Amino acid sequence: VSLVSAAVLVSGTAGIEDSSQREARAASDDALATRIETIGVEAFVRKWLAQPLFRDLNDANSQVQQRLTNLASGLADSLRRCSQGRQEPRWAQLAEVKVPVLALAGARDEKYVAIARRIAATVPQGTLAIIPDTGHSAPLQSPDETASRIASFIADSSAALR
């Protein structure tokens, strides 16, 4: 018996397989956490959102405003503890997943599009959704299209359970 009937992964991954790449990612995330503590949340968020993958987000976005209220210590701690570099890869277990999985990514986020394709191809009931003209934060950059794709997936998954 499964605890869930379906799963949606938005710009998700099953981990970094290469141990040296995991170690490098953990070190990079630790350095970024220290930078957040040094420059503060507002400066960090503004610099982070200046990246091309987030170009559609601006100060008017309520999620951006919410992020600006975070504590530097909390963001840094989360980054250190939840770094992909500290997570064991789970690619081998994906073939054992028994529920439908939607792997969703923004089309401009080439890295996570490739990961989403691999996840959807590996999970027996995997489905791929690529949101056009969108970067890494599909729910923030293209909320209507993202919600529509997720709603369709849930409806299809629910119909298959009946």
Stretches with model-predicted labels:
Residues 3-36:
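Flexible "cap/lid" loop of the alpha/beta hydrolase fold
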Residues 48:
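Gly/Thr-rich phosphate-binding loop signature of adenosyl cofactor/nucleotide-binding cores
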Residues 63-92:
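Hydrophobic, aromatic-rich cap/lid helix
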Residues 97, 103-105:
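Short beta-strand/loop motif that positions the catalytic acidic residue
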Residues 110-115:
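Conserved alpha/beta-hydrolase "acid-adjacent" motif
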Residues 120-137:
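Catalytic histidine neighborhood in serine/cysteine hydrolases
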Residues 134-143, 147:
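Catalytic histidine-centered segment of alpha/beta-hydrolase-like enzymes
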Residues 149-160:
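C-terminal alpha-helix
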